[in-house]
From Swiss-Prot:
Mg(2+) binds at residues 21, 23. It comes from Cupriavidus necator (strain ATCC 17699 / DSM 428 / KCTC 22496 / NCIMB 10442 / H16 / Stanier 337) (Ralstonia eutropha). PROSITE patterns: HD (PS51831). Catalyzes the addition and repair of the essential 3'-terminal CCA sequence in tRNAs without using a nucleic acid template. Adds these three nucleotides in the order of C, C, and A to the tRNA nucleotide-73, using CTP and ATP as substrates and producing inorganic pyrophosphate. tRNA 3'-terminal CCA addition is required both for tRNA processing and repair. Also involved in tRNA surveillance by mediating tandem CCA addition to generate a CCACCA at the 3' terminus of unstable tRNAs. While stable tRNAs receive only 3'-terminal CCA, unstable tRNAs are marked with CCACCA and rapidly degraded. Monomer. Can also form homodimers and oligomers. Belongs to the tRNA nucleotidyltransferase/poly(A) polymerase family. Bacterial CCA-adding enzyme type 1 subfamily. Pfam families: HD (PF01966), PolyA_pol (PF01743), PolyA_pol_RNAbd (PF12627). It catalyses: a tRNA precursor + 2 CTP + ATP = a tRNA with a 3' CCA end + 3 diphosphate; a tRNA with a 3' CCA end + 2 CTP + ATP = a tRNA with a 3' CCACCA end + 3 diphosphate. A single active site specifically recognizes both ATP and CTP and is responsible for their addition. This is Multifunctional CCA protein. Its cofactor is Mg(2+); Ni(2+). One of its GO terms (molecular function) is phosphatase activity. Signal peptide: none annotated.
Length: 411
């Protein structure tokens, strides 16, 4: 049998980028031969094995045939007569359909095997599908969009974009399971320029099917004095790119993505104002989170940011009592780390505006100082001092916290 490293590891080597892991394909072997060599079977849908020493995954070369809609609708053939070329032709993009042989020590040997012009497309900075079999797996639309967020200087070949549009029109993306959609969106949000993912999804029509709440933001105007970029969709893309530039975690990036969904439902006769968009945003994102089965930690932070980002922006003008009420609505005393992430999302929101990219955000330091002061109040001591008058405990703790906040930040 012969082992090859395939896909991303070869692509990244040619780009001079580090590769986090390698994918291996084994040609000319049976499952029994792999187990006899010490490999442990782990694949459910097709034969995948763990290397006895490195624990890396090795898959038998395979072909696949479409049997139903969606990304699970495939039958696989994994016999020893499947060649490397047979395996590579089923892959999504030419830049991911290259291979190099691997020796017994795991070292890459020999030339790059590139039957589909992957090196040509790397040089041209293009995402191009290998064959029309691309259309059989709708997840590939999401993967192309995610790759665009990682390799943001790349474009999508015209024929590939045309095929993606045909897939969307045929309803292929409608068959995707929510968990897989979320997985790909989350991975794309964590790339260097997540806005590119959504640009590609918009261009092929998939965003309107997967996230219509986000799609409808494009073309919705905002007040030019607050948003020189005007267009709400453009603003949100600037915000998620700012969150990425700040190195923010997924929770913050998702909150940045969905914080203004309510602006897409603002009545036309009140534009470009968006009165009450915060509560509408919260309702819409709850629907999104249910539909895509978004993790609770992402949903919870996004709800805080959607509801309170306007107040957080204005908090420099707040009295100590108003700041304390804001902290309570955000549950900041019980969840200070989440509150810090909310402030990071709000900072990205401010900077995600034309001309504001390098602006300071003093609101964050002031509110964190207020939170620190409020948290230092000994609520237990106050409760004990109240004795049997338990009805006074809440009011006295609140008064002590407001006084502590006022002493720290004024007001």
């Amino acid at each position: 049998m012969q082992v090859y490293a395939v896909g991303g590891a070869i692509r990244d080597e040619l780009l001079g980028k580090p590769s986090q892991d390698r994918d291996y394909v084994v040609v000319g072997a049976t499952p029994a031969q792999m187990e006899a060599a010490g490999y442990k079977p782990v694949g459910k849908d097709f034969p995948v094995f763990l290397h006895p020493r490195t624990k890396e995954e090795y898959a038998l070369a395979r072909t696949e045939r479409k049997t139903a809609m969606g990304y699970k609708g495939f039958a696989f053939y994994c016999e020893p007569d499947v060649t490397l070329e047979d395996d590579l032709v089923r892959r999504d993009l030419t830049i991911n359909a290259m291979a190099r042989a691997v020796d017994a020590d795991g070292n890459l040997t020999g030339p790059v095997i590139d039957p589909h012009g992957g090196q040509r497309d790397l040089a041209a900075r293009l995402f191009r599908h290998v064959s029309d079999a691309f259309a059989e797996d709708p997840v590939r639309i999401l993967r192309v969009a995610r790759f665009a967020a990682r390799f943001h200087e790349f474009g999508v070949a015209a024929e590939t974009m045309r095929l993606m549009r045909e897939m969307v029109a045929a309803g292929e993306v409608d068959a995707l399971v929510p968990e897989r959609v979320w997985q790909e969106l989350a991975r794309g949000l964590m790339e260097a320029k997540p806005s590119r993912m959504f640009e590609v999804l918009r261009e092929c029509g998939a965003l309107a099917r997967l996230l219509p709440e986000l799609e409808r933001l494009w073309g919705v105007p905002q007040r030019a004095d607050y948003h020189p970029e005007i267009d709400t969709g453009v603003h949100v893309m600037m915000v998620i790119d700012q969150a990425a530039a700040m190195g923010a975690p997924l929770t913050v990036r998702f909150a940045a993505l969905v914080h203004d969904l309510g602006k897409g439902t603002t009545p036309a006769d009140v534009l470009p104002r968006h009165i009450g968009h915060e509560s509408r945003s919260a309702q819409l994102l709850e629907d999104v989170c249910v539909r895509l089965r978004v993790p609770n930690e992402c949903r919870d932070l996004a709800l805080v940011v959607a509801r309170e980002h306007g107040n957080i922006h204005r908090s420099q003008e707040f009295s100590a009592a108003a700041v304390m009420r804001l902290l309570e609505r955000c549950d900041a005393l019980r969840k200070p780390a989440r509150f810090a992430e909310a402030l990071q999302a709000c900072e990205a929101d401010l900077r995600g505006r034309k001309g504001f990219e390098s602006s300071a955000y003093p609101q964050a330091a002031r509110l964190l100082a207020a939170l620190e002061a409020a948290a230092a109040v000994d609520a237990g001591a106050i409760a004990r001092a109240c004795g049997d008058d338990v009805g006074q405990i809440r009011d006295r703790v609140q008064a002590a916290r407001v006084a502590a906040v006022a002493a720290r930040i004024g007001g």
